[in-house]
Amino acid sequence: MKKILLVDDSALMRRVVSDIINSDKRFHIEKEAKNGLEALEILRTETFDGVVLDVNMPKMDGIELLRALASEGISARILMASTLTMDGAKVTLDALELGALDFIHKPEWSYKCKENNFDKELLDTLYAVCNAKLKSVAKVKPVTRRTIEIQTGVEQLVRKKAASITGNRLVAIAISTGGPKSLQSVIPFLPEDLNAPVVIVQHMPVGFTESLAQRMDAISRIAVSEAKEGEVLENGHVYIARGGQHLKLVKSGRGSRVHYSDEPPREGVKPSANYMYESLSDSGYDEIICVVMTGMGSDGTEGIRNLKLNKKVYCISQEKNSCIVYGMPKAADKAGITDESVELGNIAQEIILHVGVMQNGC
């Protein structure tokens, strides 16, 4: 049974969330705290399998607690509970960069915790967080201009090999738990003249993916944006699927354009990587590079398996020891659809090697 620390300033919310967690035999709320300061005192002397952490609290909020834990070298598997607002999205991304493993959208009112499958999402996500590898989290370092410059030296060697690659290709990435932080080890190291579009399905609710795209664009050479309805995919551009909707890539000449669908969640997620991959079955690409990265569950595996029946596909899975949660890559590996397993820090160069760079600006 996993020991959980619950941190929330609302006594009523603590009671409701505690009841949900304790109803599952896998978990037990061991202790509660009503602000970050109380939680810090507890975490200085006790360890837990997971921490459910509110964002907005008096005395010390969730972000301040994460900074304090990092400053004191205290490791904890933390699940953030965030309200669904634009400010909430930005704060949540701050939390993920500071070491939180995942987040859930917490209803503003406690009585709504029984709606929209919140209880199932909470329990499933908490289970993934409790089983995440803290060592893998520590390996994912914040990106700086200096780290990009160092990696650029390696890229020059890769570019020489990639210069001769021709053809019409697409890179399609599936990622979930640990994604926002792990993507920082991939996207900023892709060149602006990458000879393919890159599409990312990151499991997130509506409102969060735009903030993620803006952050990724700010630290990357390649352009990054949230994919817009009707947009035609272009080489040298990264498109992040909008949260809360399924992304379908519709054939447009030899490429694709973006179309969103409001169909029900698939295998409990929306957007679904399976949905995106299967939409590429009649695409005009010569080859599709599928990348399955850290995350719980098996999203991506069925879609890639079906896609391989109709298209030339090269599947890269993130190597086990570099995953925060070895779930989605594990499913791909076990299904036998993986062509290569790659450590997180090498995924960008593998992408470059498989799609090449644009020659003479075209």
Language-model features: locations:
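Extreme N-terminal starter segment of soluble prokaryotic enzymes
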Residues: 1-3
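Conserved acid/base catalytic micro-environments in cytosolic active-site loops
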Residues: 5, 11-26, 32, 37-38, ...
